[in-house]
Amino acid sequence: MGLNHLTLVCSAIALLSIFVVSQAGVTSTHVRVSEPSEEMPLETFPPPACYNAPEQVHITQGDHAGRGMIISWVTPLNEDGSNVVTYWIANSDGSDNKSALATTSSYRYFNYTSGYLYHATIKGLETLYNYMSNPKGQAVLFAGDLSYADDHPNHDQRKWDSYGRFVEPSAAYQPWIWAAGNHEIDYAESIPHKVHLHFGTKSNELQLTSSYSPLTQLMDELKKVNRSETPWLIVLVHAPWYNSNNYHYMEGESMRVTFEPWFVENKVDIVFAGHVHAYERSERISNIQYNITDGMSTPVKDQNAPVYITIGDGGNIEGIANNFIDPQPSYSAFREASFGHAILEIKNRTHAHYTWHRNKEDEFIPEAVIADSIWLKNRYYLREEETS
């Protein structure tokens, strides 16, 4: 994928804001007005009316080199031709059509029977100039907690179908790369499945399973990243490692203690997390000299460390997390109890511009408001420079 301009939209989704500034950072006094959280009924996104029409179409990156794409969709029936994807070069006359066969599966879960699930991998793709210059964003990063099906009896799988239709207008046209959250953990009716954790970078996605040492997998995966081809190293987790909100405080600590030294050593640029339903951005800090068990140790600024961004604020049925710790810790640069989304524009191999947008809340605010922004400098190429 071209490096001249890459845009990532991150979500987990007052005209004048007043900020409280401390030695630590900024705590926005803007708090989203608490309103009843109403879940959309299943009928809001019904199945398509056409016979055996594909639905819930979504794409995600399909290889480590950025030249593959996985196309996924669902149909009610498994008929001849339902498992074939036809594709061609953009702006061509269609005479060079190619096709890819998809794997097919279905499943039962309590009293639910799925449609037929298809996954086709297209390989050997080239990046076109009109795609590289697309201002709409080339990928969406989602840090977990998607449909909240697990909040319903028997983890109502119809919610996944409804969610798939809901996001299709975006997910069918730009790759979504997501981490699995706690709301994605489903269990068999009697025996729990193995827990999965997902890590992603710009050019790949790593799935960690309990059958293989996550640390060993992470070490192996980080060694594969060629920073001359993939200058920016971005990681997705679900539970944040640096979180100054009383909600889910220090729930990611055991993971941080295990993995953080490797993130610093390999100069990871950004770590995005969800889980906490608010927004927070850290300084470049590390705590690799400590093994925190009581929360009393203090992280230090470290220009080899990532910026940690909690962006679990994309909207949900559980409400906003508006209980920040006071005083604001020194590692916290900016935090706000609102819903929003972020845009990361990778300008080149050394610089990226990051903005966090507070979602529109009422009719008097015409669009999302940029409440936080920062220029980021690549840790691999500009490792000794300050980031702001």
UniProtKB/Swiss-Prot annotation:
Binds 1 Fe cation per subunit. Zn(2+) binds at residues 145, 182, 238, 275. Its cofactor is Fe cation; Zn(2+). It catalyses: a phosphate monoester + H2O = an alcohol + phosphate. Glycans are attached at residues 97, 111, 226, 291, 348. It is found in: Secreted. Its EC number is 3.1.3.2. GO terms for cellular component: extracellular region. Specifically expressed in flowers. Fe cation binds at residues 145, 148, 277. The active site is at 248 (proton donor). Substrate binds at residues 182, 275-277. Homodimer. This is Purple acid phosphatase 19. It comes from Arabidopsis thaliana (Mouse-ear cress). The gene is PAP19.
